[in-house]
Amino acid sequence: MPKPTIRPPATVAVSSSLRDARKRRGIGLRRLAEKIGVHPATLSAWELGIKVAPATAVAWILGYLRVESAEYDRVMALAPCAGDANLVDQSDPQLGHLLWTYEQLSTRVVEWAPLCIPDLLQTRAYAERGLDTAVVQDDRRDMDLLSRQVRQQALNDGTRRYVFLIGDQTLHDLDDLHDAQIDHLRAASQLEHVTVRIVPSTETALRSIGAFTLFEDRSGPIAVVLRHHHCNTYVTDRTMLSRYHGTAKALLRRASDEPVSPSALRAPALIRATR
């Protein structure tokens, strides 16, 4: 089997930003390539993240496209890191943007969520409560909700497979949001391209494994993201990808096909994961 195409996170961020900026201006790829003096195939490779665009070329393209100063600064801060295998992403607008871009590059997304419902499976009420009760409030609330909405729509479209591994304690801590959130999980689990599995909290060895999302194409893992309160860490180092891929497999083996606690879930069968 061929190795997966690994695109470093900063490369993905810069390339997608160049492509989005060009499309917003309504300029065709060939026209822009002619204006900046490069071959269309070269510009296409930069926009797809197949090749790393030199920082000088990135600056020239952004200037020609007349992007706003905040966007210019954000992209130019990433440009020197374009070849790095890993990235700590601190830029607010990019938090959802890079995550979404990797999802689009994937044929399967595997998420391990030991302590909370995964973003893509949250009801709006659950998401709003999480944002409103955060230890440190910030101004990302509306942007965060919009990003989730876009990604949830993509999940419903069925363009890729999703596997969600949820710690059972998460389901016990829903309080007054319980019924609506459980119904939402049930509905999602009925989709042919979505698998939801519950991992028992009695699995002591799993308690030290923090949340992560693994992105895969048909050849294997292409990136993993570790999400934090003020930033995201994206990893594409092949050794680390292999380890997280192995961890995801181990979690799947230990997950339950049947509900862990019927009394807590208030239903005879929450999720049956047979796919």
Where do the PLM segments sit?
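C-terminal regulatory/effector modules of DNA-binding transcriptional regulators
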Residues: 176-275
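Interdomain hinge/linker segments and adjacent boundary elements that couple functional modules
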Residues: 2-25, 29-34, 41, 45-173, ...
